[in-house]
Amino acid sequence: MANKTVLFNKHLESDAKMVDFHGWDMPLNYGSQIEEHNAVRQDAGMFDVSHMTVVDVTGTDACAFLRKLLANDVAKLKVPGKALYGGMLDHNAGVIDDLITYYLTDTHYRVVVNSATREKDLAWIAEQVKGFDVEIVERPELAMIAVQGPNAKAKAATVFNDAQNAAVEGMKPFFGVQADSLFIATTGYTGETGYEIIVPEDEAQALWQGLLEAGVKPCGLGARDTLRLEAGMNLYGLDMDETVNPLAANMGWTIAWEPQDRDFNGREALAAIKAAGTEKLVGLIMEAKGVIRPGMSVFFTDGEGVEQQGTITSGTFSPTLGYSIAMARVPRSIGDTAEVEMRKKRVSVKVVAPSFVRNGKQAF
């Protein structure tokens, strides 16, 4: 039996096409993936992300533990509510998961991890916590709804109560605040403004219904994937996993090398990889007809005239741009053009930074 989120019946009410997603019954779309995608880029859309795993890390050693566990440094978080994105690495510097950590107090952090990696993540965290005065508490009684798009905050404001609206007023990106029963964060996976709202399960259906009545369009996994790829955001399992180090996954900016005496998991292996050089993740755009798909091969000739090869990690048709975009892991010597092998032919592509659309506009 697949797991169902507390919003399952709400999806059926909106005629969702349901699919299995890592053991969860989740909406693929509600009739038109393109319309859902465009709603988020132009107005407001919402996603059921209740399958994500919320974990509270509490105790006197909470900060010290997370400084060991994560490649980014939670000691940088000084203001309550501030959030941090980063990787949880194994001892070989492979990416176990990418996650967001919220600093609530010196003894309380909240971590949100991917659903597909839940069991692996929790097992790794339980192993690493030995010796630290820390309690790890999973919060399965919490649901999560992401409301994204240029009009998302205004429409959510009509559903929030006065205290909640006061709590989020002027809140900068990458913050979270507990406002009555809701934990409201200015984070997302679309490249648009908006909120990710953690809500008690018994209130989730009413919140979803309120947002629906406020004119927020329900969106499924299909639109979530095209939106995140346009935004150049990694998908765990495609763009990185335990066989990939963060420097080869466009996550170098999330590695806190300073202070030098912070011994985070995988640091020694990652430093050796950095010194030796590693592949990189780039963006590709193809204005010719066709769609670039994961697993396709990328070819280019380096500065010394030698043919080099890489692999597409994520690829799709971009509804916003009107042509195919992709992310590819390639040797660092790549220039600004390459070729992708499609149907036994090579098609020219442009190489760009892996970020295609932000706030509804072309980003490269």
Curated annotation (Swiss-Prot):
Protein name as catalogued: Aminomethyltransferase
Annotated signal sequence range: none
GO cellular component, one term: glycine cleavage complex
A Pfam family this chain is assigned to: GCV_T_C
GO molecular function: aminomethyltransferase activity; transaminase activity
Record organism: Shewanella sediminis (strain HAW-EB3)
Gene3D superfamilies linked: Aminomethyltransferase beta-barrel domains, Aminomethyltransferase fragment, Probable tRNA modification gtpase trme, domain 1
Enzyme Commission number(s) from the entry: 2.1.2.10
Similarity comment: Belongs to the GcvT family.
